[in-house]
Structure formats: C-alpha cells, structure tokens
Regions:
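Negatively charged, low-complexity tracts enriched in Asp/Glu with abundant Ser/Thr
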Residues: 1-15
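Short A/G/S/P-biased low-complexity tracts
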Residues: 164-172
C-alpha cells in the first residue's frame, strides 16, 4: 500500500467578510496540503476554520489543542480517502502522514497561540523507486525506473528524481549548513 505524501500545513488568522465586503468575523485558518502519489503529482488540500472564541478556549485549556489537532488529522484522513474513492484508487496508508501532521500541528498551535504569528511547516518527503518499478512523473506520464532511485518531494519546489548517492550528497550539504 502506498503512502499519501504530506506537503505543507499552516496556521494563520483569516477574516471572514459579509456579502457587502465588510469584515464579519476573524477566525483561525488551518491549511493542509498533500499529494496523492497513487493518482499523480497533483497537489490537494483543504482548509479548516476555527472561531476566535474557540481559539481563546484553546489558550486557556491546552487539552483543547490536542482535541483540535486530532479532529484536523481525522479530516485530513477522510479527505484523502474520499479522493482515492473518487479516482477508484487503492486507499493510501494514512497513519504515518496523520502522525506527522499531528506532531506538526501540536507545535504549530502552541507557537501560533503564544506568538500570534503565522506558522507554516513544510514536510519534505522521500519516496523510494526500485529499479524496474513504474512511477508517474510531474508531466503525468508513466516511466520505468532504470536504476534504484528516489523522488524527493519539496513542497513548493516541485519534485526531483535522484539516485541514492545523489540524495546522500544533497543531505550532507544540507547538514553542513
């Protein structure tokens, strides 16, 4: 079973306007994006709004942060499952991505509620592509891997196919920075 690839999560203030364009309410907007590898390299996402009143409760009662994070992780799993169903694709294993999202959002909500600054987290992912296996490239075409390789997914920067050795060199450069 393949995995859904988590790309990005963000938390920030979002103003809701009435039909005349006047500010009506201020909410916290949570945005989550991912890539359903089984379908293609198409990015998917959803937004979740939290009222300012509930945000105040979350500040006073930290256990509400965990409740909200669990709720958003369930929304993510549900949205991804519905998408797979629509495309008649094998369901993704969401457990790893949900756990990663939970960890990121717990940190994010604490940071956002303490500092009142927008929080954004990019999840870089690595997919192993064994020699001979087929993969779908960004152009939507299917290709066969000519050697053991990996696809490194950088949120916002696209995807990059590379060999294990190239990946190790890239990681060493990043670790030195």
């Amino acid at each position: 079973m393949k995995k859904a690839i988590l790309l990005c999560a963000s938390i920030g203030w979002q103003t809701i306007y009435d039909e005349k364009g006047r500010p009506k309410a201020r909410h916290i907007g949570v945005s989550v994006s991912w890539m359903p590898y089984e379908i293609s390299y198409k990015r998917c996402g959803f937004n979740h709004l939290i009222s300012a009143e509930y945000a105040n409760l979350m500040q006073r009662e930290p256990q509400r942060i965990e409740m909200m994070v669990d709720h958003i992780a369930r929304c993510f799993a549900s949205a991804a499952a519905k998408l797979m169903e629509q495309h008649h694709a094998e369901p993704s294993d969401m457990s790893e991505a949900c756990e990663e999202l939970r960890r990121g959002l717990l940190e994010g909500f604490r940071s956002f509620l303490e500092n009142d600054k927008i929080w954004i987290h990019h999840f870089n992912q690595v997919l192993n592509v064994p020699k001979g296996s087929r993969y779908r490239a960004e152009d939507g075409e299917w290709y066969e891997a000519e050697e053991d390789a990996m696809i490194v997914v950088h949120c916002g920067a696209g995807e990059q196919m590379m060999t294990q050795a190239e990946y190790e060199r890239m990681k060493q450069k990043e670790d030195k920075k």
